[in-house]
Each structure stands twice: as structure tokens, then as C-alpha cells.
């Protein structure tokens, strides 16, 4: 509370805040007559202030000691503020014209009483109206500092005009906002009165103490703690992931609502003094906000692994999304450290994210798994790599910024030829990312080529490559990777897939294709029997071997079946139609001619499900006639 000791008006208890100079007030006439008249007016002002101010002396044993002036009567509160303003003007006059006047000593005493009352009112309003001054309510009134409805309500000389302004404001805002605006106006009026009278230090001290506790409490309720590096070294990654998710939610509320609301409130209450509001906001927010942005830096310093990249990118994206608010709220020099800490965290995160990308590439290159995928199916490295890359593609904004600063340290002309040239600013921004993704997939394809060599069967190698390239193409085509890599990339790799599929057909089925005569025109019965036996043997061998092959993708599976059937069935049908009648009198015809053309299609349709068929009654020369009938083969 303001002390009651006698003081010189110009020797403020707060050296930082000086009362306005006499020249800022109304000039007083210099003639003796006018001077005497003015002095009489000033002395009368002091006497008038005496009755108003002493009524609200916080140290007198009356009801006013326990009652809030601003809650009791807004009309009296306005009158009190005006009395303080007039008393200050009178003191300026008396100091300059009659420093020995007994009225000056009285005025000084009254000023001390008034400041004690305003100091008490300021604290009570701040403490008892936390609900009306919560950051969410304040931040909802983003333009309040420039809204005339809320300006100088307490300082208005015209009560009716002030009331009209409040009524006008009430038409466009909710009751909650109206109550909040009224409380803010009261605080502003008190702050301006105390600062103009040299009591800014006392006013600011109260404000800082109350509002800092609110900010600290708000962050604590959001789950923000005092962060220290040692805490992170002892925390497992699962717990840290949970902390990251909580921090992102808390930071969004903390910046967009808590700190923004505090900045708006501080700017409004201390709008008369830039230095005061900056100093206030620094004391209230700097420590808490700096601590808030230390969290991402500590996380970024932990062990770097590609598995941890996504939470790191979530942190990076969260800070980037908040950056406009950060710059707006912490724009002046006193709180520049907050922005500096946020920038440091961003840079540390970028380094960690890039390191995780490098780690991911290294894991692909160093994969030494030698176990062969049964049936030439999809390798787990392909699935895990493409799942990871497709997830990365959802963070194109974050990764584009990072990779723009870390271009691939190799000749990328070949890669860039696979990626569509950027035609817009956004595509230009993402071009480095597109090239990087193309590179990662190329690293995977090279590794798959190496793994394909481990198969002893060439046809199985090609089927393995086709299956794995198919899932790569499918993943690219159904995720944001498509926009990043472009249709040219897809077309080139689809052509490559067709080549793998074609090579598989040649390696797996060429013996069957070549088992029939190229020109089945004039064959003797003996020659026809040889070709039938050759075809059946080749088909049985190929079918039994290929029955264990697997093609998970339905589209590729059907395309392979159709392609094989088109090459095989028509030729066999023609051969069968022409030479079967020639062998009609042969004994054991069901053994010699074992397949009808229609049933070849049935056999082919059963392929690529990974169900192996071993030498059995189905393909045994000693099978009974009924067995072959059940398969749709020629009967005797």
C-alpha cells in the first residue's frame, strides 16, 4: 500500500513513472487578478477532493474500509478518479505558484490516501475478477485496445456519454464480454491515474504479482512443468511421446489464448505507457514462455532414430503453426528471448529430423536379411519402408523446409529425370522433398534387386521384383506421394513392372509355350503324340512349380493369369482340335491327352495364391480314369 508519509509531489515513489509536466495542463493567466482567482479555484478543488477522498480512506474504521469503491458505485468511482485528476492539477499549480500554501500539504496527504485506495481497488479488482479476466475472455476481444467503446470510460467527464458508450458496446457483445470489458476499463482507469500521479511502480508491482501467478497456474493446469535436461535423459520414449502430444495441445492453448490474452490485457491496462506494458508483460510471461519452448529443444537432443521422427515433426509443425502468434506476442526487445528460444528449438528439431532421415536411409542400405520371401511375395523391408515413406509424405511442409537446407550430397540428375519438374511455387518448394523421396525408393529398389539374386529360380526372382514394385507403385499412387513424385514417375515404374512380369512369364512358362509346334499343320500321329506328351509334361512341371508362387495384388495376379492364358490356351486349343481326332483309336487316351483346353484356363486361374501342388493323383500317369474325369480331362 502507498505510504502515508509526507512527500514532495515531484519526488515520486516510482522514479520510473513521472507525473506529467505542468505545461501539459491548462495554462493559467499571469495577471494578479486572474492568478488570485485561479488559486482560489485550485484551493476549492483541494477542499472538494478532501470530502470525496477521505470518505474512501482505507485506513478509517468505516464501511468503506471493507467495501470496494468500484463495486459499490461506479458513479462514485468515476467521481473519485476525476477528483484525483483535478487534485493532481491543483498540486501542480500550487507547487508552481505558492509552494508554502497549507492547501498543498493537505493535497499531498489526500493524494497519499487516494493512492492507497486505488492501490487497494486495483488489487481487489485483479484478484476477484479472475473469471472475467481469464485469457480466453480477453483474447476474444482482440481489438479491445483500439475499440472506442472501451476507451476512457472511467475518465469521461460526461457520465451520460460514458453510459451511452457502454450501452452501445452491449448491443454488439455478449454479457460475459461486457463484464470483462468493464473490469478492464476499471483497471485501465486506475492504472492511468496512479501512473500519472507518480505511483506507477506500486501499480505495476501488484499487477505483475497477480497476473504472473495466473499465467503460471494456467500452464501448470495444461501439464507444463519446469523443464530440465536431466529429466529427459531418464524418461523412456513411450512416456516422452505422451509428453510431446500433451505439449503440442498445451502450447496451442498457451500461445493462442493464455499469452495472447495476457498481452492484450497488459496492452489495454497500460496503454498510456509503452515501457510500462512491455516491462509488465516481460515480468509476467518471459520466464514461463521461455520454459515452454525449452521442451522441444530437450526432446531434439535425445537419441536420434528414424522411429522417433514423427513426434519430432509434430513438434516442428506445431511451432511453425504458432509462429505468427509468437512473433505478434513477443515482438519487442524485452521478450525477444522467448522468440530466440523458439527459434533454437526449431533449429534443433530440424537437425534431429534430418539425422533421423539419414538414419532411415542407412537402415535400408544396411539391411542384411537373407531369408527369402516364400513364393516371391512382398518383403517386409518393402512394406516397412513404403509405410514409413508414405507417412513422411504427410509432413511435406515440415520436410520441405528441412531438405531445402540439406540437399542430397550426390548427383541427382537421374533422380530429377524421374520427378516432374515444378510448375508452381508450391511444387518448387517441395521439389527437394520429391527428389529425396525418389532417392529413398531407388535405394529400396536397389536393395530388392540384391535380394532377388538370392533366389535360385530366375522366374521367382522376377516375380519377387514384380510383387515388390507393385506395392511401391500402389503406395505412391494412393498417398500424397503421387503429387510429390508425379505421373511421370508412376508411368516409368509401371513400365518397369510390366517388364518384370514379362520376364517372369518367359522364365516360368517358356518351356510350355515352346512345347507345341510353331506351325501345327501336317503332323503324323506319332509326331502328334510326342507333342501332346511334351506339352503335358512341360505344363505339369510348370504348374506344380508355379502353384507355390504368390501374387498378393489382385490386379497384378489377374493380369498375369490373363497374359499366360492368352499365350497358351488358344495355341493348345488349335492343336487339340486338329490332332485329337487323329488319335481317337489310341488305347489309354486319357493318359496321352490329359487336358482339355477349357481346363487349362481353370488350372491357370488357380495360380498365384501360394498353394503348392505336389506330384499327386492330379498329375500322375498312373491315376485312375475317374480322377482325370473329375479334372475335366479327356475320357477313354
Curated annotation (Swiss-Prot):
Q: Which UniProt keywords apply?
A: Cytoplasm, Cytoplasmic vesicle, Membrane, Nucleus, Plant defense, Transport
Q: Which domain of life is it from?
A: Eukaryota
Signals that turn on the gene: Induced by elicitor peptides elf18 and flg22, by the fungus B.graminis hordei and by the bacterium P.syringae.
Q: Where is the composition biased (Acidic residues)?
A: 149-163
**Where mainly located?**
cytoplasm
SUPFAM superfamilies of this UniProt entry? Cullin repeat-like (SSF74788)
Recorded phenotype for the gene knockout or disruption = No discernible phenotype in normal conditions. Enhanced susceptibility to the bacterial pathogen P.syringae pv. maculicola.
Coiled coil ranges (UniProt) are: none
- What GO CC terms are in its UniProt record? cytosol; endomembrane system; exocyst; membrane; nucleus; phagocytic vesicle; vesicle
The subcellular localization recorded is: Cytoplasmic vesicle, Phagosome; Cytoplasm; Nucleus; Endomembrane system
Annotated region Disordered: the residues are 132-173, 617-636
Biological process (GO) annotations held by this record are: defense response; exocytosis; positive regulation of defense response to bacterium; response to bacterium; response to fungus; response to molecule of bacterial origin
Expression sites (tissue/organ): Mostly expressed in roots and, to a lower extent, in leaves, flower buds and siliques.
GO-annotated molecular function? phosphatidylinositol-4,5-bisphosphate binding
Gene3D superfamilies cross-referenced by the UniProt entry: Exocyst complex component Exo70
Bias regions of kind Low complexity — which residues? 137-148, 617-627
SUBUNIT field:
Interacts with the exocyst subunits EXO70B2, SEC3A, SEC5A and SEC15B. Subunit of the exocyst complex that mediates vesicle tethering during exocytosis.
Q: What job does the chain carry out?
A: Component of an exocyst subcomplex specifically involved in autophagy-related, Golgi-independent membrane traffic to the vacuole. Regulates autophagosome formation and autophagy-related Golgi-independent import into the vacuole. Involved in defense responses to pathogenic bacteria (e.g. P.syringae pv. maculicola).
Q: Which family does it belong to?
A: Belongs to the EXO70 family.
Return the protein name: Exocyst complex component EXO70H1
Native species: Arabidopsis thaliana
Gene transcribed to yield this protein = EXO70H1
Amino acid at each position: 500500500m502507498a505510504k502515508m508519509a509526507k512527500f514532495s509531489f515531484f519526488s515520486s515513489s516510482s522514479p520510473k513513472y513521472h507525473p506529467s509536466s505542468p505545461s501539459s495542463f491548462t495554462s493559467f493567466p499571469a495577471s494578479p487578478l486572474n492568478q488570485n482567482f485561479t488559486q482560489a479555484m485550485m484551493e476549492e478543488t483541494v477542499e472538494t477532493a478532501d470530502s470525496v477522498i477521505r470518505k474512501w480512506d482505507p485506513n478509517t474504521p468505516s464501511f468503506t474500509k471493507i467495501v470496494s469503491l468500484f463495486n459499490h458505485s461506479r458513479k462514485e468511482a468515476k467521481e473519485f478518479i476525476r477528483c484525483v485528476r483535478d487534485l493532481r492539477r491543483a498540486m501542480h499549480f500550487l507547487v508552481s505558484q505558492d509552494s508554502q500554501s497549507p492547501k498543498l500539504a493537505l493535497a499531498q496527504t489526500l493524494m497519499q490516501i487516494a493512492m492507497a485506495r486505488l492501490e487497494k481497488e486495483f488489487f481487489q479488482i485483479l484478484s476477484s475478477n479472475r473469471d472475467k479476466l481469464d485469457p480466453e475472455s480477453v483474447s476474444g476481444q482482440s481489438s479491445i485496445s483500439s475499440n472506442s467503446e472501451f476507451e476512457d470510460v472511467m475518465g469521461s467527464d460526461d457520465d451520460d456519454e460514458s453510459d451511452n458508450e457502454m450501452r452501445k458496446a452491449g448491443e454488439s457483445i455478449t454479457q460475459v464480454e461486457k463484464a470483462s470489458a468493464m473490469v478492464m476499463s476499471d483497471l485501465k482507469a486506475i492504472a492511468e491515474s496512479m501512473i500519472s500521479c507518480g505511483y506507477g511502480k506500486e501499480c505495476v508491482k501488484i499487477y505483475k504479482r497477480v497476473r504472473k501467478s495466473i499465467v503460471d497456474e494456467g500452464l501448470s493446469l495444461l501439464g507444463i512443468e519446469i523443464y530440465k535436461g536431466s529429466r529427459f535423459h531418464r524418461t523412456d520414449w513411450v512416456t516422452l511421446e505422451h509428453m510431446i502430444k500433451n505439449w503440442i495441445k498445451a502450447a496451442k492453448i498457451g500461445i493462442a489464448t493464455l499469452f495472447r490474452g495476457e498481452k492484450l490485457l497488459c496492452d489495454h491496462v497500460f496503454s498510456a505507457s509503452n515501457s510500462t506494458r512491455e516491462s509488465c508483460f516481460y515480468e509476467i510471461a518471459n520466464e514461463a514462455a521461455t520454459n515452454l519452448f525449452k521442451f522441444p529443444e530437450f526432446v531434439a537432443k535425445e537419441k536420434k532414430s528414424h522411429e522417433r521422427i514423427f513426434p519430432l515433426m509434430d513438434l516442428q509443425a506445431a511451432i511453425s503453426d504458432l509462429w505468427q502468434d509468437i512473433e505478434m506476442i513477443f515482438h519487442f526487445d524485452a521478450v525477444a528471448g522467448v522468440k530466440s528460444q523458439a527459434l533454437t528449438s526449431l533449429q534443433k528439431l530440424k537437425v534431429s529430423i534430418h539425422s533421423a532421415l539419414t538414419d532411415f536411409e542407412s537402415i535400408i542400405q544396411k539391411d542384411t536379411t537373407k531369408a527369402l520371401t516364400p513364393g516371391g511375395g512382398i518383403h517386409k523391408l518393402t512394406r516397412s519402408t513404403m509405410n514409413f515413406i508414405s507417412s513422411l509424405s504427410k509432413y511435406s511442409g515440415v520436410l520441405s523446409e528441412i531438405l531445402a537446407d540439406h540437399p542430397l550430397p550426390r548427383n541427382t540428375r537421374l533422380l530429377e529425370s524421374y520427378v516432374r519438374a515444378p510448375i508452381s511455387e508450391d511444387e518448387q518448394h517441395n521439389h527437394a522433398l520429391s527428389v529425396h523421396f525418389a532417392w529413398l525408393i531407388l535405394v529400396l529398389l536397389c536393395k530388392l534387386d540384391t535380394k532377388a539374386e538370392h533366389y535360385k529360380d530366375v522366374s521367382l526372382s522376377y516375380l519377387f521384383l514384380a510383387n515388390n514394385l507393385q506395392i511401391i507403385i500402389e503406395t505412391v499412387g494412393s498417398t500424397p506421394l503421387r503429387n510429390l513424385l508425379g505421373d511421370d514417375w508412376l508411368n516409368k515404374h509401371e513400365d518397369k513392372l510390366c517388364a518384370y512380369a514379362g520376364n517372369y512369364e518367359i522364365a516360368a512358362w517358356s518351356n510350355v509355350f515352346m512345347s507345341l509346334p510353331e506351325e501345327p499343320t501336317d503332323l503324323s500321329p506319332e509326331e502328334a503324340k510326342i507333342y501332346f506328351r511334351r506339352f503335358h509334361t512341360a505344363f505339369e512341371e510348370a504348374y506344380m512349380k508355379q502353384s507355390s508362387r504368390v501374387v498378393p495384388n489382385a490386379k497384378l495376379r489377374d493380369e498375369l493369369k490373363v497374359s499366360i492364358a492368352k499365350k497358351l490356351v488358344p495355341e493348345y486349343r488349335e492343336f487339340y482340335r486338329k490332332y485329337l481326332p487323329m488319335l481317337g483309336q489310341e488305347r489309354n487316351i486319357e493318359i496321352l491327352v490329359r487336358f482339355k483346353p477349357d481346363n487349362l484356363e481353370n488350372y491357370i486361374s488357380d495360380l498365384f495364391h501360394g498353394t503348392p501342388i505336389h506330384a499327386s493323383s492330379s498329375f500322375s500317369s498312373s491315376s485312375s480314369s475317374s480322377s482325370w474325369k473329375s479334372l475335366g480331362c479327356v475320357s477313354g
